Swiss-Prot record:
Stated family: Belongs to the PurH family.
GO BP terms, alphabetized: 'de novo' IMP biosynthetic process
Source species: Mycobacterium ulcerans (strain Agy99)
Pathway(s) the chain acts in: Purine metabolism; IMP biosynthesis via de novo pathway; 5-formamido-1-(5-phospho-D-ribosyl)imidazole-4-carboxamide from 5-amino-1-(5-phospho-D-ribosyl)imidazole-4-carboxamide (10-formyl THF route): step 1/1; Purine metabolism; IMP biosynthesis via de novo pathway; IMP from 5-formamido-1-(5-phospho-D-ribosyl)imidazole-4-carboxamide: step 1/1
Superkingdom classification of source: Bacteria
Gene designation: purH
Alphabetized PANTHER family for the sequence: BIFUNCTIONAL PURINE BIOSYNTHESIS PROTEIN ATIC, BIFUNCTIONAL PURINE BIOSYNTHESIS PROTEIN PURH
EC assignment: 2.1.2.3, 3.5.4.10
Phylogenetic classification of the source organism: Bacteria, Bacillati, Actinomycetota, Actinomycetes, Mycobacteriales
Protein name as it appears in the record: Bifunctional purine biosynthesis protein PurH
Domain notes: The IMP cyclohydrolase activity resides in the N-terminal region.
Length: 523
């Protein structure tokens, strides 16, 4: 027979909190219900200042707070009262023999360690905010949840008073509270351990990858479904991470879906790969078009959309600058799932919100430093994020393999094409003219098919354009597909055993060919 519904009356509570939010109301409610309160330091002082009866913990232990408050509750007369399993007659007998009374309720929140670190405090100041007694009490009470209820969040105080009035928490409720308490201390320990590892005692391994790493992920939202309707999905975020797309503010539209987030993330990164005003339009995590402009964001959007208008229908748009009214007016004529930008002109927002279904997001500029994680069966892959910072991403380091050096306008397009490759699933060929993609061949299992696809999509516009390949041409055929369509300059990493054949094909076609020495696979 289940005992989950059985309530345990609350007669005695231990309260020790850094965050005093709601403390007085809680203490008044407990006292009115006949609950004895034992408390520590500033918590006891706050309670007593309102004329509420409180027993200071040093009265209970017979031992004063010492070492600037580092030792307050670490005492057998406290922890015996927390850990005694009142279902066990031997534990009850031991308490009686020791003259120790049990606690049925523990209310504790911890020193603000993470906030102290974020404030830029010194190492010594941060160390002082590593709570010891608080987590010990929380863990003890959570372990002993058959006998004790533990609350770590001031938002739970109304529930405490409601439970007291109802005869105490049920066993089911105490189990839930214990689970939340262990999550709370786990998050705290991960924050401390991560800071110690990165700041106090940084590892000096053979690589930049730590032996251990921890992250705190909290569910931000349940999503309608996953990639497909039969898959459930949710959005999680790390509260300590730099704000990104997961923390974006939605200004308009229905709730985001799993696919909306994956496409928006790809678009957001693609737009910020370029310093000029840039717009990226993404569908199924691949670009329908990317364009830059020195004139206006509306010009960049028109050029990006012109790359592949058919595929852009129902796509996701991202731009790296404020959305103008002119751009918003054009966007509003096209079915668009999501638009994300760092800001919107008021008139632009008014225009976009007239469309019922478009989701309008404002997000902080992506901070791409750090690691990229990918789950695999039984494990996790970690790599440095591709930030377009390899030596070959600087055109000053490119090697001219054949042909005449590119003029400034052609070189600008080659650099744009090369940087755009990072946003395209491999194998990738990107054809560019006048700061805009005009043909994108993506996700092909051989490079010549990627070239054919890019040429097909570019059509007549390919004549006189430039192209980039995210990895080397293993055979001349991919390059020859591009030159036959009229491409006048190409950039690729080089490094194939057939580089000489590829370069010879470029020379025969009379084009300019650059080698970067770096590649940009995306899987």
């Amino acid at each position: 027979m289940s005992t989950d519904h059985i309530r345990r009356p609350i007669r005695r509570a231990l309260i020790s909190v850094y965050d005093k939010t709601g403390l007085v109301d809680l203490a008044q409610g407990l006292t009115a219900a006949g609950v004895e309160i034992v408390s520590t330091g500033s918590t006891a002082k706050t309670i007593a200042s309102k004329g509420i009866p409180v027993t200071r913990v040093e009265e209970l232990t017979g031992f004063p707070e010492v070492l600037d408050g580092r030792v307050k509750t670490l005492h057998p007369r406290v922890h015996a009262g927390l850990l005694a399993d009142l279902r066990n007659p031997e534990h009850e007998a031991a308490l009686a023999e020791l003259g120790v009374e049990a606690f049925e309720l523990v209310v504790v929140n911890l020193y603000p360690f993470s906030q102290t670190v974020e404030s830029g405090a010194s190492v010594d100041e941060c160390v002082e905010q590593i709570d010891i007694g608080g987590p010990s009490m929380v863990r003890a009470a959570a372990k002993n949840h058959p006998s004790v209820a533990v609350v770590t969040d001031p938002q739970g105080y109304d529930g405490v008073l409601a439970a007291v009035r109802s005869g105490g928490f049920t066993f089911a409720e105490r189990k839930k509270l214990a689970s939340l308490a262990f999550q709370h201390t786990a998050e705290y320990d991960i924050a401390v351990a991560s800071w110690m590892q990165s700041t106090v005692a940084p590892e000096q391994p053979e690589t930049d990858f730590p032996r251990w790493f921890g992250r705190n992920w909290r569910r931000q939202a349940m999503l309608r479904y996953g990639e497909n309707p039969h898959q459930q999905a949710a959005l999680y975020a790390d509260p300590g991470a730099w704000p990104g797309l997961a923390q974006a503010e939605q200004l308009h539209g229905k709730e985001m879906s799993y696919n909306n987030f994956t496409d928006a993330d790809a678009a957001w990164r693609a737009a910020f790969d370029h310093e000029q005003k840039c717009v990226a339009i993404i569908k199924h995590a691949n670009p329908c078009g990317i364009a830059i402009s020195e004139v206006s964001v509306a010009d960049a959007h028109r050029k990006a959309h012109a790359c592949d208008p058919l595929s852009a229908y129902g796509g996701v748009i991202a731009c790296n600058t404020e959305v103008s009214p002119e751009m918003a007016e054009y966007v509003s004529t096209i079915f668009t799932e999501v638009i994300v930008a760092p800001a919107y002109a008021p008139a632009a927002l008014d225009q976009l919100t007239k469309k019922k279904n478009i989701r309008v997001l404002v997000a902080s500029e992506p901070q791409d430093g750090g690691a990229e994680l990918r789950p695999i069966s039984g494990g996790l892959l970690m790599q440095q994020r591709d930030q377009l910072d390899a030596a070959g991403d600087n055109p000053a380091n490119w090697i001219l393999a054949t042909g005449s050096p590119a003029d400034p306008a052609t070189l600008t397009d080659l650099v744009f094409a090369w940087r755009s490759c990072r946003a395209v699933k491999s194998n990738a060929i990107v054809i560019v003219a006048d700061g805009a993609t005009i043909g994108v061949g993506m996700g092909q299992v051989n490079r010549v098919d990627a070239a054919r696809l890019a040429v097909e999509r570019g059509g007549e516009r390919v004549n006189g354009a430039v192209a980039a390949s995210d990895a080397f041409f293993p055979f001349p055929d991919g390059l020859e597909t591009l030159t036959a369509a009229g491409v006048k300059a190409i950039v690729h990493p080089g490094g194939s055993v057939r580089d000489e054949e590829v370069t010879a094909a470029a020379a025969k076609a009379g084009i300019t060919l650059y080698l970067t020495g770096s590649r940009h696979f995306v899987h």
